[in-house]
């Protein structure tokens, strides 16, 4: 049986609103509460591949036992007095670099923001590493032995009250789990799932260590980890939000929005069996005849229901998903076309990311991993025309093994409203949140893009990937792009500036961050830097306008566009938890070193230096010092 997709040439749109398409705080839908003040404070360091790493290793190649032992040895030599545990999400990327992750412990409890990631090269030696381990005095175990801390219900109630969460908890019961300090809190109402609480240590913004309850609450709009002081249950030390606010007849891959073409296209079996061996409709157990499969499940959620399995989705016994999309029609009239478009774009992006290295081992989103590593049963829940909000889109990324959730909304800047799923850049931007959160810090840790600069880069990566995908054959480095232009009916889009290599059109640079406090604004700075790097690489290597990259014998994309995307993705897995701009830049340089032997240092340094992130650029709490210098031995050039 063949599947027909009516896909319009809606090239992947350039825009995707993560937390909020309009300027917004960390969690815009928490009325009266600004979660920005609870963002985690970055405390990571990153030792890149250019620095000498003093550890002796046996170069036996990447055998699992050997690369894990090498990583353990590095952690022990770096922090000889620290205790820690090896996480289970280590893997070898398709660039040949192994990624091993550790969590610091104190008195057998996790230090929840104490992370150490080790990257081991093809030869078995340490390539680079990052860490945010706590190095101060360890608190006495007395607080634990005497149980001098509050119960988890008190912590939950304080979080609900202080953050004004729409959950009632008047008659809560505590259920123990296999973990001695982890509990399920039953008897609440208003949450998608039962809240959870876990006793952990937490490094506070002032650098001290304290015992906290990590309270997990999912209310759709916000999926929070709230760190409540365990002694008093009257203070919140930090908050992480998993939600980032972004035959088929469809707008095809590379078509950004309906404004670019007159009609949609009909596609037959558009998947690639190397990337989706079960196709888009099978999950290893059943061959579905609706918009459901191994990579995602798409449905309408007009009434903002908390569940999704029984929501409406089109069904075709012949897998012929061709539906009308009338120009100027009411959104409800084309709900079948909307769901089909969302299912298509998400699956197509899954397949592209797979070939660029975001596979099962790396923590991608699939129900069935076919024994290829990683945790299963975590496809993406795709809600079209979700009734929870307007003029927005969002993506929730829990750790590997739990389904992600994308909610696409209607945009009311036109009459009738426009459906965000038809601007594929929004879908791409949102899905990229899942990519960057699963790779940064490892698949089992979704808390590593929670500081201001790291969250900003989370937004910037989404804009960058959406923009790179929508490039047209006629584009040059003089081509400018906006984000959200179609849904907002505005040629300038929703960002402060267009993405451009012209400093007159877009003057943003590294020190612009000193005047910014919101992640979407900061993300525009990061994406502007990546846009410079993108065109530098295209000018050197050319541009492949096809839907998939071609690789040389080393696994390196042969063109500049896909090479830029590949290096950016590889760097996410190298960088530390909650990186800053300087560390992320260094990780991109390291990614090129691992993939090509550093053949593109000049192009990368030149792109970053043009916008103030050159050699010598520095980050210090809230204050950045820019630099336009390029290392003298890289390309003998200074901006």
UniProtKB/Swiss-Prot annotation:
Residues 1-16 form the signal peptide. SUPFAM superfamilies: Metalloproteases ('zincins'), catalytic domain. The active site is at 430. Its EC number is 3.4.24.-. Binds 1 zinc ion per subunit. Disulfide bonds: none annotated. One of its GO terms (biological process) is proteolysis. One of its GO terms (cellular component) is extracellular region. Its main location: secreted. The keyword Hydrolase applies. Residues 17-245 form a propeptide. CDD domains: M36. Keywords: Glycoprotein, Hydrolase, Metal-binding, Metalloprotease, Protease, Secreted, Signal, Zinc, Zymogen. It comes from the Eukaryota. It is found in: Secreted. One of its GO terms (molecular function) is zinc ion binding. Induction: Expression is controlled by the prtT transcription factor. Its cofactor is Zn(2+). Zn(2+) binds at residues 429, 433. It is an enzyme of class 3 (hydrolase). Glycans are attached at residues 287, 320, 336, 368, 509. Secreted metalloproteinase that allows assimilation of proteinaceous substrates. Belongs to the peptidase M36 family. This is Extracellular metalloproteinase NpIII. It comes from Aspergillus oryzae (strain ATCC 42149 / RIB 40) (Yellow koji mold). The gene is NpIII.
């Amino acid at each position: 049986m063949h599947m027909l997709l009516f896909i319009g040439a809606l090239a992947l749109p350039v825009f995707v609103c993560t937390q909020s398409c309009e300027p917004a705080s960390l969690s815009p839908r928490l009325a009266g509460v600004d979660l920005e003040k609870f963002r985690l404070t970055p405390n990571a360091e990153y030792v890149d591949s250019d620095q000498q790493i003093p550890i002796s290793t046996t170069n036996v190649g990447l055998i699992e036992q050997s690369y894990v032992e090498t990583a353990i040895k590095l952690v022990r030599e770096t922090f000889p007095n620290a205790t820690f545990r090896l996480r289970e999400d280590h893997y070898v990327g398709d660039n040949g670099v192994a990624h091993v992750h550790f969590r610091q412990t104190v008195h057998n409890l996790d230090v929840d923001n104490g992370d150490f990631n080790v990257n081991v090269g093809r030869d078995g030696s340490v390539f680079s590493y990052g860490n945010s381990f706590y190095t101060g005095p360890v608190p006495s175990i007395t607080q634990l032995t005497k149980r001098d801390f509050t119960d988890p219900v008190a912590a939950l109630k304080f979080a609900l009250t202080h953050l004004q969460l729409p959950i009632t908890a008047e008659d809560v019961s505590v259920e123990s789990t296999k973990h001695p300090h982890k509990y399920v809190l039953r008897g609440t109402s208003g949450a998608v799932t039962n809240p959870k609480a876990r006793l952990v240590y937490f490094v506070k913004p002032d650098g001290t260590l304290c015992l906290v309850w990590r309270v997990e609450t999912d209310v759709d709009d916000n999926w929070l980890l709230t760190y409540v002081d365990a002694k008093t249950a009257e203070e919140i030390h930090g908050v992480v939000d998993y939600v980032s606010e972004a035959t088929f007849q469809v707008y095809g891959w590379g078509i950004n929005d309906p404004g670019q073409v007159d009609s949609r296209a009909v596609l037959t079996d558009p998947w690639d069996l190397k990337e989706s061996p079960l196709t888009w409709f099978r999950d290893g157990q059943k061959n579905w005849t609706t918009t459901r499969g191994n990579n995602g499940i798409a449905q309408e959620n007009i009434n903002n229901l908390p569940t999704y399995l029984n929501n409406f989705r089109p069904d075709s016994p012949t897998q012929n998903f061709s539906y009308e999309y009338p120009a100027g029609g009411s959104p409800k009239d084309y709900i079948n076309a909307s769901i089909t478009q969302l299912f298509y774009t998400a699956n197509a992006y899954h397949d592209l990311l797979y070939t660029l290295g975001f596979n099962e081992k790396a923590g991608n989103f699939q129900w069935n991993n076919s024994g290829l590593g990683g945790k299963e049963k975590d496809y993406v829940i795709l809600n079209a025309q979700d009734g929870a909000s307007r003029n927005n889109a969002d993506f929730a990324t829990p750790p590997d093994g739990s389904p992600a959730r994308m909610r696409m909304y209607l945009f009311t800047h036109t009459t009738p409203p426009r459906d965000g799923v038809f601007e594929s850049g929004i879908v791409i931007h949102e899905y990229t949140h899942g990519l960057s959160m699963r790779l940064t810090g490892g698949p089992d840790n979704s808390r590593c893009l929670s500081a201001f600069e790291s969250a900003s880069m989370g937004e910037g990566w989404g804009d960058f990937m959406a923009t790179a995908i929508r490039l047209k054959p006629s584009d040059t480095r003089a081509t400018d792009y906006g984000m959200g232009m179609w849904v907002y009916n505005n040629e300038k889009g929703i960002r402060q500036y267009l993405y451009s290599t012209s400093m007159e059109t877009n003057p943003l640079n590294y020190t612009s961050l000193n005047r910014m406090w919101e992640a979407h604004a900061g993300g525009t700075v990061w994406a502007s830097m990546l846009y410079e790097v993108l065109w530098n690489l295209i000018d050197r290597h050319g541009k492949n306008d096809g839907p998939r990259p071609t690789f040389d014998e080393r696994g390196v994309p042969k063109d500049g566009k896909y090479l830029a995307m590949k290096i950016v993705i590889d760097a996410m897995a190298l960088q530390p938890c909650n990186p800053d701009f300087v560390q992320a830049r260094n990780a991109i340089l390291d990614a090129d070193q691992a993939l090509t032997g550093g053949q593109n240092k000049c192009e990368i340094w030149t792109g970053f230096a043009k916008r103030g992130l050159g050699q010598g650029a520095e980050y210090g709490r809230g204050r950045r010092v820019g630099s336009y210098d390029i290392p003298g031995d890289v390309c003998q050039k200074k901006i």
